[in-house]
Design a protein with these regions (language model features):
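Hydrophobic targeting/anchoring helices
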Residues: 1-47, 53-55, 137, 160-164, ...
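A conserved amphipathic helix/loop scaffold
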Residues: 82-288
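Extracellular/periplasmic catalytic domains that process cell-envelope and extracellular macromolecules
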Residues: 22-25, 68-69, 98, 174-175
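Aromatic-lined carbohydrate-recognition surfaces of secreted/lumenal glycan-active proteins
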Residues: 24-29, 64, 106-108
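Hydrophobic, well-ordered secondary-structure elements that form the walls
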Residues: 28, 59, 246-248
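Short, well-ordered secondary-structure micro-motifs within conserved domains or adaptor modules
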Residues: 68-83
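A short, well-structured beta->alpha microelement
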Residues: 48-70
């Protein structure tokens, strides 16, 4: 099996349309914060990566104490503690939002200030949870454990999802030219420890949470697929702007013939063959 894997990888490299694959497009910055141990940091980052991939976009990672890279979307998963993000770092992110970016934050037991003026909700009280939150989002119910419950009162936010008693847990608000989104539950940390969360058909559509705030970056991709188990990377090359190399990967245990949605003005150079289980194939998009 090892020798076959090496042969298959050699065949994959030989099939690439270019000897040197350009770097792939990254659409968002995932910010890793303080007050998390190694497992928590890895879990939050891993889930953020997978939720992004299943929605058809890619992330780059950076630590919160680094200068924030310019991006249309910032993802801050599983914020913990009072010092998970320092005030000046938080304000620096908000400046990016004022300029037009989108900021998504999910909370573990983290605290943010300012809060109400940014997110459009007021915290009336905070209490320890004795049972997981049952969240109604669209036509699905999502069950998520969390150490605390924030009892929120809406002021100017849009409520995207709420608990069964109406308490908002996922909200969106305008801030300057951009948008802020807040999830008061540790989505990413929980999913990382939930067997089958990303592929079992019995699981709800967890990627819906990321799709709610990432539509603007997803819409900019040249190729998309509705299958969460087929992931894509785009490798634009400034030297040949009329072409874009792409790679599709089948992350399932069965063969898949992927169906793509191609951006206006582009087309497949040739049809992609059926993808074998747990394998990938390169293809090229060309301008019409």
């Amino acid at each position: 099996p090892i020798a076959k894997t090496f042969r298959d990888f050699r065949a994959f490299l030989d099939a690439l349309p270019s000897a040197n694959l350009p770097p792939f497009r990254r659409d968002a910055v995932c910010v890793l914060t303080r007050e998390q141990n190694f497992d928590q940091t890895m879990s939050n980052g891993w889930s953020a990566f997978l939720l992004a991939k299943q929605n058809g976009f890619d992330v780059r990672f950076q630590y919160v104490n680094e200068t924030f890279e310019k991006s249309d979307l910032y993802i801050v998963p599983g914020l913990r503690g009072a010092c998970g993000i320092f005030r000046e770092e938080y304000l620096a992110l908000l400046e990016r939002v004022k300029e037009g970016a989108t900021l998504y934050i999910s909370l573990d037991d983290g605290a943010l200030s300012p809060f109400e003026s940014i997110f459009g909700v007021e915290v009336e009280s905070r209490e320890a949870r004795t049972a997981p939150a049952r969240v109604k989002f669209g036509n699905e119910t999502f069950i998520l454990p969390s150490p605390f419950r924030l009892n929120l009162r809406k002021t100017h936010a849009e409520v995207l999802a709420a608990e069964e008693d109406g308490n908002p847990v996922f909200i969106r608000a305008k801030y300057g030219k951009g948008t802020v989104c807040l999830l008061t539950l540790p989505l990413e940390l929980d999913l990382a420890g939930r067997p089958g969360a990303f592929h079992k058909t019995s699981e709800p559509e967890w990627r819906r949470f990321y799709r709610a705030f990432a539509q603007h970056v997803i819409a900019k991709r040249l190729v998309r697929t509705g299958n969460p188990l087929v992931t894509l990377t785009e490798h634009p090359d400034a030297a040949t702007p009329e072409r874009c190399l792409c790679v599709a990967v089948n992350n399932s245990a069965v063969p898949i013939r992927p169906e793509f949605e191609i951006a206006d003005g582009w087309k497949l150079e040739k049809e992609l063959p059926e993808l074998a289980p747990f394998s990938g194939a390169p293809f090229r998009l060309i301008k019409k």
